[in-house]
């Protein structure tokens, strides 16, 4: 870690209250592959992406969610538990948890990802959260993960069990827009951009011809979903 990287790692610990014995683990958890690739190409060999931690974190998360379900819902059918487990460990939920702790603010991203909104992209936030879980597990053990996140995941799991959890932002946005404007929202592909050789789709969601949000993604579908999420959250905020 260089000094500027160490400063961000220390700021993360101060802001979240999650303190690491081995700060290198935390640094690695916050390093997106785009940043690691840039640094490696610049001659640094000490920067590793969070992909391996994400791999471990996926397994830690599954155990964590399964344990909550096993203890809290002893009468539930296995099929129902599997459905809820899948929803509770979904990209959408992990991105929600990440936003709540402001995880995106501390991520190390390559220039291309930074420019195309990667800091607030569901997939990047979810992957980083899994990497963070693995880093905490390796640094402080499984009980620390339960101490930090059990209450929050119990909240989401309960809402999923009750059928109250909303993941389909496009459907949710359509319901609001049609009730208020009597027309469905439109999704318009406005351009594509290049990011480290990959295509990034840029989609606007419009109501009566007026753009209310813009989303970016590696596929048109992902960009539409991101635009719908931003528009939905914007409309909810305006209503409150």
From Swiss-Prot:
Protein's UniProt keywords contain RNA-binding: yes
SUPFAM superfamilies linked: dsRNA-binding domain-like (SSF54768), RNase III domain-like (SSF69065)
Sites where the protein binds Mg(2+): 54, 127, 130
Record's subcellular location: Cytoplasm
All residue ranges annotated as the DRBM domain in the record: 168-237
Catalytic residue list: 58, 130
GO terms for biological process, alphabetical: mRNA processing; regulation of gene expression; RNA processing; rRNA processing; tRNA processing
GO cellular component: cytosol
Cofactors, names only: Mg(2+)
UniProt xrefs under InterPro entries: dsRBD_dom, RNase_III, RNase_III_dom, RNase_III_sf
GO molecular function annotation: double-stranded RNA binding; metal ion binding; ribonuclease III activity; rRNA binding
Temperature characteristics of this protein: Optimum temperature is 40-70 degrees Celsius.
pH-activity note: Optimum pH is 8.0.
Swiss-Prot/TrEMBL catalytic activity: Endonucleolytic cleavage to 5'-phosphomonoester
Cleaved signal peptide residues: none
Keywords for this protein: Cytoplasm, Endonuclease, Hydrolase, Magnesium, Metal-binding, mRNA processing, Nuclease, RNA-binding, rRNA processing, rRNA-binding, tRNA processing
Annotated RNase III domain residues: 9-141
Subunit relationships: Homodimer.
Matching PANTHER family: RIBONUCLEASE 3, RIBONUCLEASE III
UniProt family annotation: Belongs to the ribonuclease III family.
Protein name, entry field: Ribonuclease 3
């Amino acid at each position: 870690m260089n000094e500027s990287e160490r400063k961000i790692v220390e700021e993360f610990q101060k802001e979240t209250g999650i303190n690491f014995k081995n700060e290198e683990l935390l640094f690695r958890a916050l390093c997106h592959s785009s940043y690691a690739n840039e640094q490696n190409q610049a001659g640094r060999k000490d920067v590793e992406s969070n992909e391996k931690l994400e791999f471990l974190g996926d397994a830690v998360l599954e155990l964590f969610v399964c344990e909550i379900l096993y203890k809290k819902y002893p009468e539930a059918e296995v099929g129902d538990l599997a459905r809820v487990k899948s929803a509770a460990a979904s990209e959408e939920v992990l991105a929600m948890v990440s936003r709540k702790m402001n995880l995106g603010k501390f991520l190390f991203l390559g220039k291309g990802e930074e420019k195309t909104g990667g800091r607030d992209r569901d997939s990047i936030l979810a992957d980083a959260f899994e990497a963070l879980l693995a880093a905490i597990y390796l640094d402080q053990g499984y009980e620390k993960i339960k101490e930090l996140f059990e209450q929050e995941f119990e909240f989401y799991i309960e809402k999923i069990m009750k059928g109250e959890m909303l993941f389909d932002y496009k459907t949710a946005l359509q319901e609001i827009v049609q009730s208020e404007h009597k027309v469905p929202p439109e999704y318009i592909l406005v351009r594509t951009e290049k990011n480290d050789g990959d295509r990034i789709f840029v989609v606007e969601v419009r109501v009566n011809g007026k753009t209310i949000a813009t989303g970016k993604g590696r596929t048109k579908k992902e960009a539409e979903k991101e635009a719908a999420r931003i528009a939905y959250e914007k409309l909810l905020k305006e209503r409150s």
